[in-house]
Amino acid sequence: MAGSQRLKRMADSVQRELSELIRQELKDPRLGGLVTISAVKVSADMGYAEVYVTVMGRELGDEQSEAANKETLDVLNKASGFLRHELSRRIKTRITPRLRFHYDKTNAYGNYMFGLIEKAVQDLPEQSSEDKS
C-alpha cells in the first residue's frame, strides 16, 4: 500500500514539473498549441514514466491534426533525455524515470461524442407540450 502511494506522489511530481518544463524550456515551434499533460503513470520500479499528453485546439479524426499530434509526440520523445535531466535536477530522487510520451485521445474523443449528441438532439423533431402528456 505504501508503495502505491509513493508511485502516485512520484507521478504527481513528474506531471507538475514536466508541465512547467515543457511550457518554459521547450521552444520548438513544431510543438504548436498548448501541450497539456493529462496523466503520468510510473512503473513499479520507477524506471519508466508513461506520460499522456493532449494538445489543445486539435480535433479527433482530422488528418492534419493527426499528423501534427504525431509530430508533437516525436518532438517530446526526442527531447525526453533533456526533460529527464532537467527533471532530475528538480525532483530529488535516486532514480529519475525514463520518459515515454503518448497522445491521450480521451479529451478529443469526449468533444467528438459531445458534438454527436448535440447534433442528434438538434435533429430530433420538436414535441409540443400537448404531445408530452
Swiss-Prot record:
- Which UniProt key words apply to this protein? Cytoplasm, Ribosome biogenesis
* Cellular component annotations (GO), alphabetically ordered: cytosol
* Gene Ontology annotations of biological process type: maturation of SSU-rRNA
Molecular function (GO) terms listed? ribosomal small subunit binding
Q: Which HAMAP family match?
A: RbfA
Q: Output the PANTHER family linked to this UniProt entry.
A: RIBOSOME-BINDING FACTOR A, CHLOROPLASTIC-RELATED (PTHR33515:SF1)
Name of the protein in question: Ribosome-binding factor A
State the organism of origin. Answer: Acinetobacter baylyi (strain ATCC 33305 / BD413 / ADP1)
